[in-house]
Amino acid sequence: MSLTRLLIKDFRNIESADLALSPGFNFLVGANGSGKTSVLEAIYTLGHGRAFRSLQIGRVIRHEQEAFVLHGRLQGEERETAIGLTKDKQGDSKVRIDGTDGHKVAELAHLMPMQLITPEGFTLLNGGPKYRRAFLDWGCFHNEAGFFTAWSNLKRLVKQRNAALRQVSRYAQLRPWDLELIPLAEQISRWRAEYSAAIVEDMADTCQQFLPEFTLTFSFQRGWEKETDYAEVLERNFERDRMLTYTAHGPHKADFRIRADGAPVEDTLSRGQLKLLMCALRLAQGEFLTRVSGRRCLYLIDDFASELDDARRGLLSSRLKATQSQVFVSAISAEHVMDMSDKNSKMFRVEKGKITD
């Protein structure tokens, strides 16, 4: 699946744009603040319903406008799909697929699996566990049909349980929430464990190519003690949870630990090495999806040259080309991406929100 056309209206500093895209590499070149990252963000938003630089909708809609509008055309092997997303200042969204309203953002995410690599993406490695849970959950979402519904229900139940902890005095009063929560928690943890076990070899192989000087290990931690039933954990920790007023154990506390030569990667690797590792993990995840489902990711890479020398840029470029996926790359200078270009690539110049090819 590739994005063949993108229409942008009133998104960030872009008043209007209509882009015909390459199924291969698409380069966005311009000075800082020109709007090149806004194009990447528009694509990301079309597939996620939210921007990656700000959760405040007012900062994403162009100044003095009421809403942004994004439209795209996706070309699959057998058919083309038209998609659209409109979002106003109140945060209300309208999703259209093939001309019909009433669709969910999750449907867009399923149609457009994508991997995002940005200078801020180091949080996958040096941020809190929620970023690594999101990494696993992306894979589970695209590999398990029931994951999104289960995950949404889990979030709702944990929130309700936390609210109930402020009101109850005995565990029996909390049991109705736990009877719903326990099977969901165990199912989501099984999916995460199965996914992490399935992808770990792909990650290790790709990371070895990018960072041969390190031995990297990966471990999934489900959020409560091994070999212990979640029901037992919840009941045993009731008084502590009640004092804390939140549920201290469960899949919402899971983590996916990454170590280099036995130490946390954030304590061992340089910024350039962390970026390489982040790229390797995103590539491995995208390639795993293709291998198990036949579907290809879109790759969005912001500020391609930052933190990487010529050799490392060349390695990333060659691996991206090998995926045969659609790739969007932003850079300050065309010189930084010329080695990636071929006869099927497209180069877009971005200046003050205006885009030309």
UniProtKB/Swiss-Prot annotation:
UniProt GO MF annotations = ATP binding; single-stranded DNA binding
Question: Where does this protein reside within or beyond the cell?
Answer: Cytoplasm
Give the GO biological process terms: DNA replication; DNA synthesis involved in DNA repair; double-strand break repair; SOS response
Pfam families per the record?
SMC_N
Q: Which SUPFAM superfamilies does this chain map to?
A: P-loop containing nucleoside triphosphate hydrolases
GO cellular component terms, semicolon-separated? cytoplasm
Q: Which residues bind ATP?
A: 30-37
Q: List the keywords (alphabetical).
A: ATP-binding, Cytoplasm, DNA damage, DNA repair, DNA replication, DNA-binding, Nucleotide-binding, SOS response
Give the UniProt family note: Belongs to the RecF family.
Task: State what this protein does.
Answer: The RecF protein is involved in DNA metabolism; it is required for DNA replication and normal SOS inducibility. RecF binds preferentially to single-stranded, linear DNA. It also seems to bind ATP.
The name on file for this protein is: DNA replication and repair protein RecF
Question: What is the organism lineage in this UniProt record?
Answer: Bacteria, Pseudomonadati, Pseudomonadota, Gammaproteobacteria, Enterobacterales
